[in-house]
Structures are given as C-alpha cells and as structure tokens.
C-alpha cells in the first residue's frame, strides 16, 4: 500500500513507472503482433481442412504467444533474456543479431518506444486515476491492432 500512496503523490515516479511498464508491454506486443496472425492462419487452415473433410496437417511444434522462445528469423539463434530488454538491447546489439549479425527490424524498438512514450503521456495527462488504466489498456490494444 505504501508504493501505491507513493505513486499517487509523486507524479514523476508514476510517469516513470508507466514508461517502464509501457516498454515492457511494448516488448510483449511485438510478440503478439508477430505471432497472432500466424496462429490465426494455422487455426483457419485447420478449420478449413476439417470442413472440407481433408486429413489434418500434423503440427511440427507448439506455436503460441509463449512457445517457442523468440529467435532470429534468419539463423534461428534463440534470443537470450539480456538480448530481449526493450530498446536497450537493440542499442547494445547495434540493431543486429548477436549470432549472425543480420539486421533486426527497426519495427521492434519503434513499437516498444511508442508504447513507452504513449504510456508515459497517458500517465502524465490523466494522473493516478482509473482513467489512466483504461486508457493504457485501450492504447496498448490499438497499438497491437495497428
């Protein structure tokens, strides 16, 4: 409860926490943006095969928002936790895969930055209110859909 009171009475701390939370959510949204269309496509294909009474295609591996772990699309290098820190790891790796040195799309840090900046602005504009929570959820959802 002490933390809640502190955040409610210190706007800078609240906005800073909102920015950090926004960066983390932005990192997760990158996963959603990349994987959800692929998951839907697989599901639609399976449904179509069922309706057309065709044999199902065996799925090679589990593919959802959690599994498999993130990896480089070029070389398959599994991304380590320290390579997955929002924005900072992109700068540290100079925008390239640590294994094959293939450039990483600028979309990833831009989504993270946009989410962090928008979250900070919302926290600053609405303050420590229920509207902030509602606007954050709406903004994150819209960002994922865009």
Describe each PLM feature range.
Residues 1-146:
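A membrane-topology feature that recognizes alpha-helical transmembrane segments
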């Amino acid at each position: 409860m002490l933390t809640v009171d502190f955040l409610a009475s210190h706007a800078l701390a609240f906005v800073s926490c909102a920015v950090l939370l926004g960066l983390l959510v932005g990192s997760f949204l990158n996963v959603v943006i990349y994987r959800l269309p692929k998951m839907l496509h697989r599901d639609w294909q399976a449904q179509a095969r069922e309706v057309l009474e065709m044999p199902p295609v065996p799925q090679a591996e589990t593919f959802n928002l959690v599994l498999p772990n993130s990896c480089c699309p070029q070389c398959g290098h599994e991304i380590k936790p320290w390579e997955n820190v929002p924005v900072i790891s992109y700068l540290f790796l100079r925008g390239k895969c640590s294994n094959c040195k293939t450039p990483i799309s600028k979309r990833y840090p831009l989504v993270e930055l946009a989410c962090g900046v928008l979250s900070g602005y919302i926290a600053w504009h609405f303050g420590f209110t229920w509207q902030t929570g509602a606007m954050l959820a709406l903004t994150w959802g819209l960002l994922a859909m865009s």
